[in-house]
Every structure is written in C-alpha cells, then in structure tokens.
Design a protein with these regions (language model features):
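Glycine-rich phosphate-binding loops that contact phosphosugars or nucleotide phosphates
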Residues: 102
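N-terminal positively charged helical leader segments and presequences
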Residues: 1-95
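Gly/Ser-rich helix-loop-strand patches that form or flank binding pockets
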Residues: 98
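RNA substrate-binding interface of SAM-dependent RNA methyltransferases
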Residues: 46, 72-75, 81-86, 108-109, ...
Length: 158
C-alpha cells in the first residue's frame, strides 16, 4: 500500500508550485528539474536518481507498472502525492500525460569529475534550442563512443 498525501484542490500550494515549475527560472532558483512520464521516472530510478517528490494521478496511467514504480520510489525515499485528474492536467507539460511527474534535484559536474581517456573524445555543442535536437545529438554521440557532451549556452533545459 502506498503512503501518499491526497491533493484535489487546484489552489493547493504544491499544485501552484508545480505549475510555476513549468518555467525554467523557478526550476533553476529551486535547483530542481521535472521528469514526466513512466519511462523517465523508471530510468531515473534505475540510475540511482531518487526524486524528492512524485505527483501521480492513476486516472492518467497508461500501463500496469506505475504502482510498482511508485512503491520502488517510495522505498528509496521519494515522498508521494496522489493528485486529482484535473490537478494533474493542470501541472502536466506533455501533450499526452502519463500520470506521473517527479521533482528531482539538479546536480553539477565539472570536467574534472569525469573519467576520460587521453586524449578524450568530447563533443561540445552550443545554443541547442529544441529538446528533440539535443536528444538526437546525445544518441548519436553515444553511438559514436563520445565520452562526454558539453553543452554551452544551453537554451534547452538539461
């Protein structure tokens, strides 16, 4: 059984904050980012990235594994909030919501933190505006064996 706080009001402070977090400035100020959808949340947990908070609405679930994912996240320390269908519709930023949004703390790495070969195989990109373009670049870099991608002057939220 999940231990989740119930939220139904659109006037709830947490819902209002989630709506604000759709914009980059509040996310940067709070040093967090949002991950929406089953796949994003599942991959985060697989990599040891535990969301601070997860907001979910079973009315939007598209599969059968969401509850198991929520149990796993809660066992690793995520605080869960079950929100109404209407509230989720308001906070979701994807065209087709999947019923799960996580708040994850930002982290920073320096090039000194990376274990690179000598000489390193790096890709440096600048002013990537569209998330889809960045995704294509990352997949291509991975396929080519690039060790690190350095994003300069990023317009896309990483």
């Amino acid at each position: 059984m999940l231990d989740a706080e119930q939220i139904s009001s659109l006037q709830n402070d947490r819902i209002k904050n989630l709506v604000k977090l759709r914009n980059r400035r509040p996310r940067d100020q709070q040093r967090i980012f949002l991950a929406e959808g089953y796949r994003a949340m599942s991959r985060a947990l697989e990599k040891g990235i535990v969301p601070r908070e997860i907001y979910f609405s079973p009315d939007w679930f598209q599969g059968e594994n969401e509850m198991d994912l929520l149990k796993r996240a809660q066992s690793q320390g995520s605080k869960l909030f079950e929100i109404s269908k209407i509230a989720f519709e308001k906070v979701a930023y994807r065209d087709r919501p999947e019923g799960i949004i996580g708040i994850i703390s930002q982290w920073n790495y320096s090039i000194k933190d990376l274990a690179l070969s000598n000489p390193p195989f790096l890709l440096i990109v600048e002013s990537i505006e569209k998330p889809g373009n960045l995704g294509t670049i990352l997949r291509t870099a991975d396929a080519a064996g690039v060790e690190a991608v350095i994003c300069c002057d990023s317009v896309t939220n990483l």
